[in-house]
Amino acid sequence: TVLSYVNALKKIFVVEESPAWNPNLRSKTAIRTSDTRYFIDPSIAVASLGIGPKDLINDLNTFGLLFETLCIRDLRVYAESIKGKVYHYRDANDLECDAVIHLRDGSYGLIEIKLGGDSLINEGADTLKKLESRIDITKMKNPSFLLVLTATGKYAYRREDGVYVVPI
């Protein structure tokens, strides 16, 4: 079965699951609680597909998915060093957040991962602000930060709306 293959891949550290984040929200929208699977090393996916840099440049959707996997891997390493965990969020209305870093003290940050470019960065920031507006701050803290993680740019900066844009 597919599940036995997934379990085998987890045992040999090819894939890893990212659990769903379940915050207190003001809306009654159902939150999807299934795990998301990522390659531990996105180069495994590239090698198994038999593709190279030119192929990825010509297929930005695949490139974006692999970039997201790379970023999730790095975010997990950073989060583990401060005893945090990385989650993902998606609700029934398809509002999603690529990564939520959550610390034991209840603080957390919301992260959207985008290849770059103003329109994608704006889209990521809008998504983060929308999710932030739905969090019930009477039951949990405000997010410590909102961040769009990108593949482009020389410097990190803070936008006027408070969202950080950080190149990996």
Predicted feature residues:
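Domain-level recognition of nuclease-like catalytic cores that cleave nucleotide substrates
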Residues: 151-168
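Short beta-strand/turn micro-motifs composed of small residues
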Residues: 90, 148-150
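Switch/connector loops and helix/strand junctions flanking conserved nucleotide-binding motifs
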Residues: 47, 120-122, 155-160
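Accessory nucleic acid-recognition modules appended to NTPase machines
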Residues: 1-107
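Mg2+/Mn2+-dependent nuclease catalytic core
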Residues: 116-137
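Short helix-terminating capping/connector loops at secondary-structure junctions
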Residues: 82, 138-143
